[in-house]
Amino acid sequence: MRTLVAAILLSSVFLHAQTDGIWQGYDPEWSHVSRQLIALAEATPQEKFAWRPGPDVRSTSEVYMHIVIGNFYLLSVTGPKMPAELSSLDMEKTVTGKAQVIDWLQRSLDAVKTAHATAKPADLRRKVKIQGVDADVDGIYLRIIVHANEHMGQLIAYARMNGITPPWSQ
């Protein structure tokens, strides 16, 4: 009897692991990129938030706010509403102070973390439309994490061009 109970328990663990697939690593990876984004923003002096590598290229604050807007927009495609205060895409250009940018960044990172952590496997398989194209919710979450990492690389380059070493590299 104990063998049967053990077999049932083990099979449920393996069955659960199979349904998680790639997504079992999402939450730790999201936490990792979130910590790095916040740490890099905090390590960047206020005056460097206006820095841009050239004309017509996003400034440091604009890159962070682009991540914020992207997080909330992509998350809204999966169901949660965008914050009312996130009035327009112009916030990329109007929210430029370090404290404000970090506050918005943290809010957007937490929103993604909470939404993903509460999603059930069926939620991740649900179909949604984004810009007229069919997608699965899990594909949207993949886009969110790829987008955050893409701009993390950009922000690391900005930091290094300004003599700032990312805190995790010191």
Question: Model regions: which residues?
Answer:
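Acidic/histidine-rich alpha-helical segments that form the ligand environment
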Residues: 93-128, 135-147
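Well-ordered alpha-helical scaffold segments within catalytic/enzyme domains
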Residues: 36-41, 75, 111, 115-116
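Sec-dependent N-terminal signal peptides
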Residues: 3-14
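Short, contiguous alpha-helical
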Residues: 27-31, 35-38, 46-90, 129-170
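Residues within well-ordered alpha-helical secondary structure of globular protein domains
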Residues: 10, 43, 66-69, 107, ...
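Boundary at the C-terminal end of the N-terminal hydrophobic targeting segment
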Residues: 15-19
